[in-house]
């Protein structure tokens, strides 16, 4: 199987889907690997480093001729022209956010494997490290954009406690998963107060025990509680994600209007559509805008801003799956590995993820029924 590592075209995206170390694992297993020129530069990997591990450096167009194309984020619309029948595209594709790319993949007969929908032992194994990074960085961005020079309230999130008692900021975090706890931990490290809004009762108990000795309040998620707590936020971070599907707009414009002027609103799951009515995708180079008096931060690829860290995390997570596909062939790998099967969103043009099908009102078939 010919495997290609392509350079990301998304603005500000410095990650690469495969490290030189992982290229060596593939070539040692007898697979041919091509790497687009400068694909790894943003993460600190030169073309020479890939060549030394057995890869051939190629052009963008040549990379897309491969049987298996390994990416970080969804293909750019300029890359749709390179799709070919039975080609496998691997990455954090977030297909629920764009019906156009799904229809193009269906038309051509592409197979799409989305890392964010791979579930192992009930957990989003590949997404978790990226969620952790996005959560931590969101807390930092909230502090940064709280400063007056960036349009914020002009507050120092840590407060001041030397001979005076000026309280720190309040972070309201919507959701209680990996991204949420990582955001909360950074906020606590900044001496901020944290309110977590979570739906699941078992998770609420877990969070209450986890933060029993911290300045954290855990609140049951209801529309009424959300509307009440968001008014307290100096920084509001939504972490709600439904793997493979678009989440509902749970944070309404009226709720945003009720927030403090100059407060900061961040949606970590904006790459899947987000839960906030007033938010739209932004970029790492132009990350914020003001609406209803609130600073909106809608960067969909936050880990791409810290590529040296995030590339190592994602590459460590995906290499075993990629090796299994290359060694066994996709169909056998799917049959042998239940977690991998959950990542197949489209198989040769057929939608095989129920959440994705529901998001775009498309026909759904279970993956094992399609390949048998």
From Swiss-Prot:
Active site residues of this protein: 94
Gene Ontology BP annotations: L-alanine catabolic process
Pathway field: Amino-acid degradation; L-alanine degradation via dehydrogenase pathway; NH(3) and pyruvate from L-alanine: step 1/1
Annotated GO MF terms: alanine dehydrogenase activity
Keywords, in A-Z order: NAD, Oxidoreductase
InterPro entries linked: Ala_DH, Ala_DH/PNT_CS2, AlaDH/PNT_CS1, AlaDH/PNT_N, AlaDH/PNT_NAD(H)-bd, NAD(P)-bd_dom_sf
Enzyme Commission number(s) from the entry: 1.4.1.1
SMART domains on file: AlaDh_PNT_C, AlaDh_PNT_N
Listed Gene3D superfamilies: NAD(P)-binding Rossmann-like Domain
Highest taxon of source: Bacteria
Catalytic activity: L-alanine + NAD(+) + H2O = pyruvate + NH4(+) + NADH + H(+)
Residues holding NAD(+): 170-200
The UniProt record lists the keyword Transcription: no
Record function comment: May play a role in cell wall synthesis as L-alanine is an important constituent of the peptidoglycan layer.
Family affiliation: Belongs to the AlaDH/PNT family.
Alphabetized NCBIfam families for the sequence: alaDH
Protein name, UniProt field: Alanine dehydrogenase 1
Species assigned in the record: Staphylococcus aureus (strain MSSA476)
């Amino acid at each position: 199987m010919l495997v290609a590592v392509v350079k990301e075209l998304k603005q500000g995206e410095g990650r690469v889907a495969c490290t030189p170390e992982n290229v060596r694992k593939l070539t040692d297993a007898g697979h041919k690997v091509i790497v687009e020129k400068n694909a790894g530069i943003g993460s600190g990997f030169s073309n020479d480093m890939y060549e030394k591990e057995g890869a051939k450096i190629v052009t963008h167009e040549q990379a897309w001729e491969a049987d298996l194309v390994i990416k970080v984020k969804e293909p750019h619309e300029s890359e749709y022209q390179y799709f070919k029948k039975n080609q496998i595209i691997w990455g954090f594709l977030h297909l629920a956010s764009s019906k156009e790319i799904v229809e193009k993949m269906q038309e051509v007969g592409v197979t799409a494997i989305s890392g964010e929908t791979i579930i192992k032992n009930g957990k989003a194994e590949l997404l978790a490290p990226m969620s952790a990074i996005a959560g931590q960085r969101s807390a930092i961005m909230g502090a940064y954009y709280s400063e007056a020079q960036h349009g914020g309230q002009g507050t120092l999130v840590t407060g001041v406690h030397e001979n005076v008692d000026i309280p720190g900021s309040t972070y309201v975090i919507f959701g209680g998963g990996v991204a949420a706890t990582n955001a909360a931990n950074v906020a606590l490290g900044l001496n901020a107060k944290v309110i977590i809004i979570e739906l699941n009762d078992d998770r609420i108990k877990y969070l209450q025990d986890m933060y029993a000795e911290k300045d954290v309040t855990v609140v049951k998620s209801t529309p009424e509680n959300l509307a009440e707590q968001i008014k307290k936020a100096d920084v509001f971070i939504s972490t709600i994600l439904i793997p493979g599907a678009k989440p509902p707009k749970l944070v309404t414009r009226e709720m945003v209007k009720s927030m403090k002027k100059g407060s900061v609103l961040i949606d970590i799951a904006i790459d899947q559509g987000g839960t906030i009515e007033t938010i739209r995708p932004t970029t790492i180079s132009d990350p914020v805008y003001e609406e209803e008096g609130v600073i909106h931060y809608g960067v969909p690829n936050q880990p791409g801003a810290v590529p040296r860290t995030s590339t190592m995390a994602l590459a460590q997570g995906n290499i075993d799956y990629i090796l299994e596909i290359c060694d066994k062939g996709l169909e056998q790998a799917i049959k042998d590995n239940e977690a991998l099967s959950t990542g197949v969103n489209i198989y040769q043009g057929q939608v095989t993820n129920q959440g994705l099908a529901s998001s775009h009102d498309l026909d759904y078939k279970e993956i094992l029924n399609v390949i048998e």
